[in-house]
UniProtKB/Swiss-Prot annotation:
<dbReference type="InterPro" id="IPR029063">
    <property type="entry name" value="SAM-dependent_MTases_sf"/>
</dbReference>
<keyword id="KW-0808">Transferase</keyword>
<dbReference type="GO" id="GO:0160105">
    <property type="term" value="F:tRNA (adenine(22)-N1)-methyltransferase activity"/>
</dbReference>
<keyword id="KW-0963">Cytoplasm</keyword>
<keyword id="KW-0819">tRNA processing</keyword>
<comment type="similarity">
    <text>Belongs to the TrmK family.</text>
</comment>
<protein>
    <recommendedName>
        <fullName>Putative tRNA methyltransferase MG248</fullName>
        <ecNumber>2.1.1.-</ecNumber>
    </recommendedName>
</protein>
<keyword id="KW-0949">S-adenosyl-L-methionine</keyword>
<dbReference type="Pfam" id="PF04816">
    <property type="entry name" value="TrmK"/>
</dbReference>
<dbReference type="GO" id="GO:0005737">
    <property type="term" value="C:cytoplasm"/>
</dbReference>
<dbReference type="GO" id="GO:0008033">
    <property type="term" value="P:tRNA processing"/>
</dbReference>
<dbReference type="GO" id="GO:0032259">
    <property type="term" value="P:methylation"/>
</dbReference>
<keyword id="KW-0489">Methyltransferase</keyword>
<dbReference type="InterPro" id="IPR006901">
    <property type="entry name" value="TrmK"/>
</dbReference>
Amino acid sequence: MKKRISTIANLVQSFNPKLVYDIGCDHSYLTSYLIKTNQNLTIVNSDISKNALLSNYQKFKNNNNIHFFVSDGFNNLPELNINPKIGVIAGLGGLKIINIISQKENFINRFVIQPQSNLIELRSFLSLNSWDIVNETLVQDREFIYPILVIEKLKKPFKLTKELVILGPKLINFKDKHCLMKHYQCLLRVYQPKQKPSLMDLKIIETLNKIITSYESS
């Protein structure tokens, strides 16, 4: 978990924000990491679980820059007048991330997101709804490989090809090819067992098999 959290934190810090919204903060590990390097950073932690937030509040109650809200996504979050701001949604399923950033209350145009599932469906949504994937990386933490994306809202639509939705427009040039192929193999195992695959499922299987075979024969 340390490597995953530190990678998310480093991506957040690369934008030099003054305000961070950690949506679905769970145990507020990200807040703990961020305030070690920037005591002046304002951080809003939100979670659907009141009990989780109460436990986190006890750890940070003496820091006036750290705030806590029980909220399902943006439903109960205040828009603080501090800029630049960035949102983080990490450790939730891809469909839940889609739900959150689609909420009409959403006031954030840049996020670091780390989906636990439905990565391809998430990329497809981003492409169809004017969200640009400006960065994407993989982090291997113990036996798990986590995709982490930085996304920004565009003023004009920008659609990815099906192949780039499947493979990732930034991941195709990922330097650690061994880690990348392990990631693609994990994705392939999600789609292969389906009894009634859709046309998109078949395209995903074909595309992943093709790039994995190409790597193994090189």
